[in-house]
C-alpha cells in the first residue's frame, strides 16, 4: 500500500501533481506554476503542499528536461485548437499573452503556422450569416463586428468582400 500523501516529501508530491496536470493537456510554464501553487482538494478539504521555492524550480526543470513542459509545443497546439474553434489571430495572441507566453514566441508561432486567416474569417462569416454574405452596409457592419469580436484582423475581414467582388 502506498504511504499517505502527507508523509511523502513535498518535491515528490509536487512532481506527481505536475505530471498529472500535464498528462491531461499541454500547459504553459506560468499556468503550471499557478496550478502547482494552488491548494489541492483532499479528503478533509483544501490542502496546501508545504514546498519551498526550490522544490517548485526543481519540478519545473524536471518537466522541461523530460519534455513534459514545452512552451513552443504548447503555443503551436493552442493556435491550432483555437483556430479550429473559429478564433482569429488577434484573439489567440491575446489569450497566449494571458497564459504567460512572450510576445516574441507568439509572433514567431503565428508566422510559422500555415493558417489562411482570411479564409477562416470567410468560413466563420458564412457559418453565421449564410451564403451569399450580405452586401448592404448595415449587414456588412454586423459581419465585421462579429469577426472583430472573434479576433480577426480588419485586413482579413475586408479581404472577404474583395474576393466576393471579383
Curated annotation (Swiss-Prot):
HAMAP family associated with the record: RecX
GO biological processes: regulation of DNA repair
Protein name: Regulatory protein RecX
Transmembrane segments: none
One of the record's GO cellular component terms: cytoplasm
Any matching Pfam family: RecX_HTH2
Cell location: Cytoplasm
Function, in words: Modulates RecA activity.
The gene coding this protein: recX
Keyword field: Cytoplasm
Similarity-based family: Belongs to the RecX family.
Keyword Metal-binding applies: no
UniProt KW Cytoplasm keyword: yes
InterPro entries per UniProt: RecX_HTH_1st, RecX_HTH_2nd, RecX_HTH_3rd, Regulatory_RecX, WH-like_DNA-bd_sf
Location (main, coarse): cytoplasm
Amino acid at each position: 500500500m502506498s504511504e499517505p500523501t502527507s508523509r511523502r516529501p513535498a518535491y515528490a508530491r509536487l512532481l506527481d501533481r505536475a505530471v498529472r496536470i500535464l498528462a491531461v493537456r499541454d500547459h504553459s510554464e506560468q499556468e503550471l506554476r499557478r496550478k502547482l501553487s494552488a491548494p489541492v482538494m483532499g479528503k478533509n478539504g483544501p490542502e496546501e503542499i508545504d514546498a519551498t521555492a526550490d522544490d517548485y524550480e526543481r519540478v519545473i526543470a524536471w518537466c522541461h528536461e523530460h519534455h513534459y513542459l514545452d512552451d513552443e509545443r504548447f503555443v503551436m497546439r493552442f493556435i491550432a485548437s483555437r483556430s479550429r474553434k473559429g478564433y482569429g489571430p488577434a484573439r489567440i495572441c491575446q489569450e497566449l499573452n494571458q497564459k504567460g507566453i512572450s510576445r516574441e514566441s507568439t509572433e514567431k508561432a503565428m508566422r510559422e503556422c500555415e493558417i489562411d486567416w482570411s479564409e477562416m474569417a470567410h468560413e466563420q462569416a458564412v457559418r453565421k450569416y449564410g451564403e451569399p454574405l450580405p452586401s448592404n452596409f448595415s449587414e456588412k457592419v454586423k459581419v465585421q463586428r462579429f469577426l472583430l469580436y472573434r479576433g480577426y484582423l480588419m485586413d482579413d475581414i475586408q479581404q472577404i468582400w474583395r474576393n466576393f467582388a471579383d
